[in-house]
Every structure is written in C-alpha cells, then in structure tokens.
Amino acid sequence: GARLAPFDIAELREIMSYDEMELDKIGDRKTALFLIMSDTDTTFNFVIAMLQSQLFNLLCDKADDEYGGRLPVHVRVIADEFANIGQIPQFDKLIATIRSREISASIILQSQSQLKAMYKDSADTILGNCDTTLFLGGKEKTTLKEMSELLGKETIDLYNTSETRSNQKSFGLNYQKTGKQLMTEDEIAVMDGGKCILQIRGARPFFSDKYDITKHKNYRLLADENEKNRYKVEKELNPQYTPKSEEEVEVIHVELSE
C-alpha cells in the first residue's frame, strides 16, 4: 500500500533491517542521541516517530523489569519541532506514565494549535501532563487566549467619580474591587522579544528575561561561537574524509614499537 511505499527504497530497508541503536541501554548510562530530520520533506518523519515510540516503551519496560520501576540514569527527550515529527502512537498515555520511570519529555512547538492539529482531542491530555509551560512569544490567537487564561486574574481597585454641575453642585465617589486578566491577549502578543513567561505547577507564573546563551560557560564549544566546532557527518560516513583547506585539524603522532 501507499503507507509502505517508503520501504521500496533500498537504503531505508537497510537501516530498518537490524538494530544498531541499542535504545534499551540509554537508561543504563549517560548517552546523547541526536535525531535529525528534514524540515522541508516529511517523507521519513514516520521513522523518527516509530523510534521514539519504541524508545519510550522499551525504557518503561526495562525500568519495570530490571530496576524496580525507575531507570538508574534519567532520560530526557528534547523534542524540538514536535508537531513535525509525526504522530507518536499512544503518546497521550505514554507522557502520563514515563515520569515515574525517570523519563521526561520537553515538547517544543510553534503554537498549541500545531499539537491539536496532530493529536486532536488528545492534545489537552498531553498539555495537562506537562508540569512546566514556557512561552517564548508568538501571536497565534489560540495560544494567546490559553496563555492569558492560564495566568489567571489579579484584583485591582476601581474608583469612579461623578460630578454634577447645576444649581446644587454634587460630587460622588464610588470604590470597588474587580478582577482583571494578569496579562491580556494583546499584552502577551506585544511582549518584548527578550522576555518569556514560565508557569510551573504549584507556583505563581514568572515573567522573566530570556537566558542569554552567549553567557553560558560552554557557549565557546558551539559552532555558533567557532565554526570549527561544527559536527561534520562526512567524517563518520567516509573514513577517508579529506579536510577542506579552511578546516583546522589536530594531528596526533603515535609511535608504535616493533
């Protein structure tokens, strides 16, 4: 059928024919696994969705069967452009159970409507299982409305004065307390680009400055700081990779005794 058409590609069949990932061992030791997909072609997104589904299920089973319910090493999944990965089967149920196994997930979206388009009625369940919500800015109406409602209301003092000018001059003052949205939708929409809103379950929301990544002690190790730090996949794919003229390479001399 059409859904299996990608498997007509020999390279994909080769990748899927055997296991080199050892996903079940990620919770045993510190591991960094990067899943990189095209942001313009969604043909192979289902592969990453399948991998993540297997990852969650394998780690949950291993936590239960071998470690008494919790993995020895915390596993954090940072799912950037989550809506473009493809639908992960039963994710609304997985996200409710993984935390007890020492697994967490950070879902990164352009707007909440992306999640609802992908997961339909299950989107609210997924959002409800996220203890922390970090809003970096945007102007999508549904997201703005939900953020405003999430922040809640504040109490303000309202004074009304009235004055009548006639033969008998009168003056009136009315005082009352009323509720107002902590931040209205239009206030959130025009929020300064250097600000963010952080909501943690059980705590009042924070209106804060975004962290300046250039001040991080390890920023110097990123390719943004120095191009020579950029990971070159060609080196892994081609053992006889020849560095380009502008690349800096480290030469190590090893003397072998006879």
Where are these regions (language model features)?
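Conserved ATP-driven motor cores of ASCE-family P-loop NTPases powering translocation/secretion/packaging/pilus
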Residues: I95-I197
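P-loop NTPase motor domains
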Residues: G1-I103, M118, G128, T178, ...
